[in-house]
UniProtKB/Swiss-Prot annotation:
Keywords: Chemotaxis, Cytoplasm, Hydrolase, Phosphoprotein. Coiled coil: none annotated. This is Protein-glutamate methylesterase/protein-glutamine glutaminase 1. CDD domains: CheB_Rec, REC_CheB-like. One of its GO terms (molecular function) is protein-glutamate methylesterase activity. One of its GO terms (cellular component) is cytoplasm. It comes from Saccharophagus degradans (strain 2-40 / ATCC 43961 / DSM 17024). Involved in chemotaxis. Part of a chemotaxis signal transduction system that modulates chemotaxis in response to various stimuli. Catalyzes the demethylation of specific methylglutamate residues introduced into the chemoreceptors (methyl-accepting chemotaxis proteins or MCP) by CheR. Also mediates the irreversible deamidation of specific glutamine residues to glutamic acid. It is an enzyme of class 3 (hydrolase). One of its GO terms (biological process) is chemotaxis.
Length: 365
C-alpha cells in the first residue's frame, strides 16, 4: 500500500509533472490535485491523504491560509513547494511558522528536464514525513526513510511558534564550560528552521559569545530566514558577509549557496563560493573544521535535526582540539540523522532535548 499524496498547485504544468514524478516511486501515489487553497481544503477532507505538497501563491486562497485551515482540523504533514526568490523564501518561512514541516525549492528547469536530483529530493522528503501520517504503511513499504521520529514530527505539526514552557529541567552538565566558550557553532538540516528558531529566539540580548548557524538552505532563503529571526529575537541576527567581525550577542547565519569559515585568527568570518564537490552549501563540516582550526577548545558545537551526516567529520576535528559538542536527542528531532552520526561516532559530550538546548546555552555559556 502506497502513501496517498495530494498535490496543490495552480500551474497545470506543475500538476502534471509532479504527479508523474511522485508516481514513479512505488510507495507514493497522487490521489488528488488541487488548483488552489480552497480546493486543497475540500480534497483533504474527502480524500484523507497522508501528505500534501503545497504551492503558496494561488488564486482564491493562498497556500499559507490553506495550511492553517487544514492543520486546524488534523495533523497532516505539508511540504511547501517554494519559489527560489526572496519573496518565495519569506512566504515559505511563514508557512513553516504556520505548521508546514519542510519545503522543496521550486525550480522550473529541474522539473522540466526530469532531474534525478529533484526526484530523489522529492521522494525522500515525501516518504520521510508521510511516515508520521500513517506508520502502518511505513511498516509495509518497500523503502523506509530512516531516522524520522513520529513523536517529533507530530509535535511540529501540532505546535505553534509561540513560546512554551520547557518539558523538564535542564540536566546536570557533564563538562563545565562556563567562561571557556568563545564561539557557539550550530549545524542543522531537515527540521532545522523551526529548531534553530526555538533556540535563537530564547537567547538574551546580552548573550556573551557570537553564534554561527549553518542551516541547509538555498540562496535567498537564508537571507529571509535571518531577517525573520532578527525580528523575533532579542539577540541581533544577520546573514553573514565576508569579513564580518565576530561579536558577542550576534548570530551569523551562513548564506545559502556559499561556504562559511571562521578566519584563522578566530576574529572574523570568511565567505567562499560553494565548492561543487560538496553536497551542502553551506556545509556544517566546513564551519566546524574552520572553527576547530581557529578556536579549538573554545568552541561549543551543536548538531541539530537533519538528514545525512554533515557535521560529523568537522566534529571529529573539533573533538581532537578539545571542543565541546552537544547533539539533539532522538525524540525531539524531526530527522535523527546528523545528530545520530555524531553520537554514534562517540563525539558528543551531551545529548539534549531541543527544549533544553537554549536553557543550557543561557546557564552554561
Amino acid at each position: 500500500m502506497a502513501y496517498k499524496v495530494l498535490v496543490v498547485d495552480d500551474s497545470q504544468f506543475f500538476q502534471v509533472r509532479l504527479k508523474q514524478i511522485i508516481n514513479e516511486h512505488p510507495d507514493l501515489e497522487v490521489v488528488g490535485i488541487a488548483a488552489n487553497g480552497q480546493e486543497a481544503i475540500d480534497l483533504e477532507e474527502s480524500l484523507r491523504p497522508d501528505i500534501i505538497s503545497m504551492d503558496y501563491e494561488m488564486p482564491h486562497l493562498d497556500g499559507i491560509s490553506a495550511v492553517r485551515s487544514i492543520l486546524s482540523k488534523r495533523p497532516i504533514p505539508i511540504v511547501m513547494f517554494s519559489s527560489m526568490t526572496y519573496e518565495g523564501a519569506t512566504i515559505t518561512l511563514e508557512a513553516l511558522d504556520a505548521g508546514a514541516v519542510d519545503f522543496i525549492p521550486k525550480n522550473f528547469a529541474e522539473v522540466s528536464r526530469d532531474s534525478v536530483v529533484l526526484k530523489k529530493r522529492l521522494h525522500e522528503k515525501l516518504l520521510l514525513f508521510a511516515q508520521k501520517a500513517k506508520p502502518s504503511v511505513a511498516a509495509r513499504s518497500t523503502t523506509q526513510p530512516s531516522g524520522v521520529r513520529p513523536s517529533a514530527l507530530g509535535a511540529n505539526l501540532s505546535s505553534s511558534r509561540s513560546p512554551r514552557p520547557a518539558s523538564s529541567a535542564p540536566s546536570a552538565p557533564k563538562k563545565r564550560i562556563k567562561g571557556l566558550v568563545k564561539l557557539v557553532a550550530i549545524g542543522a538540516s531537515t527540521g532545522g528552521p523551526v529548531a534553530v528558531s526555538e533556540i535563537i529566539t530564547r537567547l538574551p540580548a546580552n548573550f556573551p559569545v557570537p553564534v554561527i548557524v549553518a542551516q541547509h538552505m538555498p540562496e535567498n532563503f537564508t537571507k529571509a530566514f535571518s531577517e525573520r529571526l532578527n525580528r523575533q529575537s532579542a539577540v541581533e541576527v544577520r546573514e553573514a558577509q565576508d569579513g564580518d567581525l565576530l561579536k558577542s550577542g550576534v548570530v551569523y547565519v551562513a548564506p545559502g549557496g556559499n561556504q562559511l569559515m571562521v578566519d584563522k585568527t578566530g576574529r572574523s568570518i570568511r565567505i567562499l563560493d560553494g565548492d561543487a564537490r560538496l553536497t551542502y552549501k553551506p556545509s556544517v563540516d566546513v564551519l566546524f573544521a574552520s572553527a576547530a582550526s581557529a578556536m579549538g577548545d573554545k568552541v561549543l558545537a551543536i548538531v541539530l535535526t537533519g538528514m545525512g551526516a554533515d557535521g560529523c567529520d568537522g566534529a571529529k576535528l573539533l573533538k581532537q582540539k578539545g571542543a565541546t559538542i552537544w547533539g539533539q536527542d532522538k525524540d525531539s528531532c524531526v530527522v535523527y540523522g546528523m545528530p545520530a552520526a555524531v553520537a554514534k561516532a562517540g563525539l558528543t559530550d551531551e545529548v539534549l532535548p531541543l527544549d533544553q538546548v537554549w536553557q543550557r546555552l543561557v546557564s552554561d555559556v
